[in-house]
Amino acid sequence: MHPLPEYPRPAMRRDSYENLNGLWKYAITQTAEYPAAWDGSILVPYSPETKASGVGRTLQPGQWLHYHCTFAPPPGEGGRVLLHFGAVDDACAVQVNGHLVGGHRGGYWPFTLDVTAQLNDTGRNSLWVAVQDPTDSGTQARGKQTLKPGGMFYPAQSGIWQTVWLERVPENYIQSLTVTPDYDARTVTVKAHTSMPGGAVNLWAVVRAGGVTIAEDWGNDEADRDGEVTLNIPEEHFFPWSSDTPFLYDLTVGTTQGGEEQFDTVHSYFALRKWSCEPDARGVLRFCLNGKPILLNGLLDQGYWPQGLYTPPSDAAVERELSEVKALGFNLLRKHAKIEPQRWYYHCDRLGLVVWQDMVNGGSRYNLWFVTYLTNVLQPLVRRLPDAEPLWGLLSRGKASSRETYRKELQATVEALRCHPCIGCWVPFNEGWGQFDAAGAVQAIRTLDDTRLVDEASGWYDQGGGDVCSIHNYFYPLHVKPGSRTVALSEYGGIAWPMPGHEAPGKTYGYGTAKSRADLTARCKKLQLGTVLPQLKKGLSALVYTQLTDVEDEVNGLFTYDRAEIKPDANAVRSVNAALAAEFAKVTR
């Protein structure tokens, strides 16, 4: 049985699929050489630091983590065989049958290797992956990972942490899709990026709504390797995506070249929806979905699991958690300091959960007093401090190479996730962690994707750009003032309660501590109805409570770390969310 057996890339599916998750051999050594002996078995795709992996060892900077398995090629003959990795943290080299087939750097992004030339088609094949991960001794994106966990920073994880799989594809195949819906024009433009070395690419696309074909067309692009087609959505089949009605259109794309009868076919989906910031009936600037004001009310979600750290126990566990969030009356998750596997976003797409996506923070080791502790307390003094070059060193981006790495990571993030309708806002920087030239980051995002909002600097070191005036407030009275950007309370709350029987050993962390379920419920209700609700009429348009679940010794989640219990009273949470929605509807009319 393969862990996480579901097809890992719902937005670009093929029928050919061979899952390689399962027990592999592993070794941790001091060199990049093939290990003389193996240390044991590891359950892929769980990192060696996790309980689920069966290993429970931390990879140190400078060490090498080696993986080995054998595999048979996918069924079929001819074409190409592709080896896909959902994510490997952080840098890796991959060999098949003793031949280097490629590598990758960056622990949060998928990559694909063509292994056709190295395969033994009639027998078993040897796969060796060698990994290094500097964690917080490097400057690469790492999120909340640290080798010295505590408080708001958590244990490191390394190596393969998303699904590994094989596909057999035609000789000329689709490498990626760019799908761009246009809500106002009621169209969708599909561009297929192919492996074809030259000549005209014929692209065929069909759109279905509820199983009924509603649009289809051929495109012919004489440009090298790529084909493009734009399809019109009939008015009678125009179903906008929203949190209440998250309608997804099915999309099938096929290609051929020069009139040949050899097709590659992939299946995808898309939605028609539009994000904007517009004045409400009273002239106050609001977030708008499909031209209508929307209160975005949600939770900070860091995506950690007690047994698997970054990797969930199952797809069903992910789906269940997201469904529970929706059932409580929330419509937003801020994905904080992590990029999830593609299936997480797919479930948000179909459930109607809006996602604000952080770029994963990196940079040199943080001066926490400067970027977190003092800034949290002295926020009014530092909020508009410029993130110009004199500050880059203090904000952990002193090296030009680190800044260039961030730019590449930003591009990789947008390109990997822009296919998902659920994403409503990009967040390039959080609380100054590795921040530099936020205005440049906003421009880079808009060049890559101008269909979403941008929260330039979540928390502080606000440079006045982007679409969002983004406030983190755990300690001060809340006073919202309308301005030229829409106002979001992008972090608040964080009330801790270590629920008996579900608490982590050691110290607990949070922003104020409740004594019981009743006390936690009362505190949350007072904060949200007494402090937050009155600010809605003044322009507050998005709320992100800290946080969805407990994480390690940070025990300020609505749910316990093991997801077994909701900590405040669930009916009270639903009642508060209904009251916030009703008040927002009232003050925006």
Across the structure, where does each feature detected by a protein language model lie?
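Secreted/periplasmic carbohydrate-active enzymes, especially glycoside hydrolases
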Residues: 1-347, 351-355, 409, 424-425, ...
